[in-house]
Amino acid sequence: MNQVMTIFLVLGVIVYSVESSSTPDGTWVKCRHDCFTKYKSCQMSDSCHDEQSCHQCHVKHTDCVNTGCP
């Protein structure tokens, strides 16, 4: 059981290291934060008044993260 946990821990560290080296953490975190801030503003605005219109806020947030964040 200990060997299995060690293997998963090592794999997790490797994946984290690869992710960290491929994208600067500060930029990625700031980008995600900016997208989420826009999402919250969209939900609080008058354009979010029913399920379908509020869903557009989610769509815009997803697009922001997928296309704008490295």
Curated annotation (Swiss-Prot):
Key words, A-Z: Disulfide bond, Metal-binding, Nematocyst, Secreted, Signal, Toxin
Molecular function terms from GO: metal ion binding; toxin activity
Main localization, broad class: secreted
Signal peptide: 1-20
Keyword Disulfide bond: yes
Localisation per UniProt entry: Secreted; Nematocyst
Lineage: superkingdom: Eukaryota
Gene Ontology CC terms, in alphabetical order: extracellular region; nematocyst
Disulfide cysteine pairs (residue numbers): 31-69, 35-64, 42-57, 48-54
Tissue: Expressed by acrorhagi.
Functional description taken from the UniProt entry: Toxin that is lethal to crab. It interacts with divalent metal ions (zinc and nickel) suggesting it may function as a metal ion chelator to regulate metal ion levels or as a metal ion transporter, or that its function is modulated by metal ions. Is not active against any of the voltage-gated potassium and sodium channels tested. In addition, it does not show activity in bacterial and fungal growth inhibitory assays as well as in hemolytic assays.
Domain notes: Has the structural arrangement of two alpha-helices stabilized by disulfide bonds (CSalpha/alpha 4(S-S)).
Miscellaneous: This toxin interacts with divalent metal ions (zinc and nickel). This suggests it may function as a metal ion chelator to regulate metal ion levels or as a metal ion transporter, or that its function is modulated by metal ions. Both Thr-23-Pro-24 and Cys-69-Pro-70 are in the trans conformation.
Similarity field: Belongs to the Acrorhagin I family.
Protein name: U-actitoxin-Aeq5a
Organism: Actinia equina
